[in-house]
């Protein structure tokens, strides 16, 4: 039996395209939700006077994907702390929200809102409301990015690559229990899909990070806690994004080709068990999009 949720994520062109890429989603429809006018037109909604949010109706198979997983992935596609703005789009019609028509979904949805609050250190401004009305958008807005591959999209292209990577990695890891094997497959798949200079793990052993599975050129064997980018991420228990490695105090240069770097801690319970280290040959490669998705990938481990 199919179920339905409604997601307001900014411009519905990009939001619909994002949800179409989620395994278990069977149908998507862009439209206008939770306003004060029946059957509005795009031109009316655009005035920001009707109260509607650009929204995507998502029909999904709960045997394949859960409401909680849809909300988790949705949060990875938006800036949940931005009020009435996503990307370059500004106005109440671009506010973010999750609208439900089945109250039994509410506990699972709320749990993902709480998880987002913990990760962000603040409550999302994303609305969580029952659906009060939804009207499909005009035909020209449906499947917009399929019809116009070069059309405007407020989401970065790498968000779609990470979405596919995240889903495929979950299937690849399956029920394998060995952490080293899981790290090895993760490093391999990230390298295959994202083409970074170096991708690998350092494992926490005592007071030292010790080199684990990786893809790339030979690297440092050991890094002390608090040293370099990897040791700093371990000590802080937070992701560290470095736009220019030459500007990071105490940077440990394992490769002269590395220009920017991101390090994500792998946390179990309250303890860091490893860090995921990724380097790029270009300056400023990594940003909040990379951080959000790579943190979700580390949660799979």
Regions found by a protein language model. Give the residues of each.
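Short glycine-/small-residue motifs
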Residues: 274-275
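Flexible coil/turn and secondary-structure edge motifs
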Residues: 1-165
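Intrinsically disordered, low-complexity terminal regulatory regions
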Residues: 164-221, 296, 300-301
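Juxtadomain coupling helices with adjacent low-complexity linkers
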Residues: 170, 280-301
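A short, aliphatic-rich beta-strand micro-motif
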Residues: 260-267
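Acidic-histidine catalytic/liganding microenvironments
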Residues: 22, 141, 193, 242, ...
